[in-house]
Regions:
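Helix-start/capping segments and mature chain N-termini
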Residues: 1-80, 87-91, 114-312
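Short, acidic/charged, Gly/Pro-enriched secondary-structure junctions
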Residues: 85-100, 104-113, 130
């Protein structure tokens, strides 16, 4: 018997919009909203996890700070404080009675005027939250996923502002993801404009060779991921070295292991790139150690990082 998944708009629950809780089905904007036409908006992806102490949001303050930084880069003045947005995210998780789930804050430009310039328009903010499991599949978390290098190139750092988690930037990700999933792969890898590895369609990438972990530096156009930063802390705790450098595709082909990271992807092993098996073709030992340490942290089992968890 197939399970019917409700559409994103037709659900019970509450969404926080511009300071008010509204019924899920009533959370609407006008079709002439500026962001809908020109793509200038910013968002975050945040996760809440079930812990022994209760439901907690992982690295809430850092996600909210990045949202505000993205808005600043896009010259959007969010009409709320970071503390108010933090409170809104906690409230949405409570209102929707989530033990764990995904949280989506989004800021957009309103419908006061239309035209390329948004000057004088209104800025809005919403926060939604819902239950969401493993982004790239539960099996992929253990076995690893199949990845293909996309024919699409990641944005140059001076074409779009790559350190903004901007709505418009994800057209590039959408095209890359559709291209490779249509061919049966799980996710896309994108190169930068010089042909070096940048990141996945929605994830940062790490590569393991001879016990050393490598990841592209941010000049390759990759987003400064919060899960990426978390892995740096985990690696230090485990006595593992991380080197930020330019990485070529063929370095991944001959790597021992590779994995994606992201709020949605969490820590997902990569078993294959471009039909070439990586290492043993399964989750490697370094990846497994990092993955285990990550889930210990987000589920409240590592007291060293209790400050990263905000109870709702």
């Amino acid at each position: 018997m197939s399970v019917v998944i409700p559409s994103m708009s037709d659900r019970d629950g509450k969404i926080w919009m511009d300071g008010q809780m509204v019924d899920w089905r009533d959370a609407k904007i006008h079709v002439l909203s500026h962001t809908l036409h020109y793509g200038c908006g910013a968002f975050e992806g945040v996760r809440a996890y079930k812990t022994e102490q209760g439901t907690a949001i992982f690295r809430l303050a850092e996600h909210t700070e990045r949202l505000f930084n993205s808005a600043k880069i896009l010259r959007m003045a969010i009409p709320f404080t970071q503390a108010q947005v933090n409170d809104a995210q906690r409230a949405v998780v409570r209102e929707n009675k989530l033990e764990s789930g995904y949280i989506r804050p989004l800021t957009w430009i309103g419908d006061k005027k239309l035209g390329v310039s948004p000057k004088g328009n209104t800025i809005h903010l919403m926060v939604a939250a819902w239950t969401w499991g493993a982004y790239l599949g539960e099996e992929g978390m253990k076995r690893g996923i199949r990845v293909k290098t996309s024919s699409y190139t990641r944005h140059h750092v001076n074409i779009t502002m790559t350190q903004a988690k901007a709505v418009s930037n994800y057209t590039n990700s959408i095209l890359a993801n559709m291209e490779v999933t249509d061919e049966g792969y799980d996710e896309a890898l994108l190169l930068d404009t010089s042909g070096f590895v940048s990141e996945g369609a929605g994830e940062n990438i790490f590569v393991v060779k001879n016990g050393v972990i490598y990841t592209p530096d941010l000049s390759a156009g990759a987003l400064n991921g919060i899960t990426r930063n978390t892995v740096f802390h985990i690696a230090k705790d485990l006595g593992l070295e991380i080197v930020q450098k330019r990485i070529t595709r063929d370095e991944i082909y001959i790597a021992d292991e590779a994995f994606f990271t992201g709020t949605a992807a969490e820590v997902t092993p990569i078993r294959e790139l471009d039909r070439i098996q990586l290492g043993a073709g399964s989750r490697g030992p370094v990846t497994e150690k990092i993955q285990t340490a990550f889930f210990d942290i987000v589920n409240g089992r590592n007291p060293k990082y209790a400050h990263w968890l905000t109870l709702v």
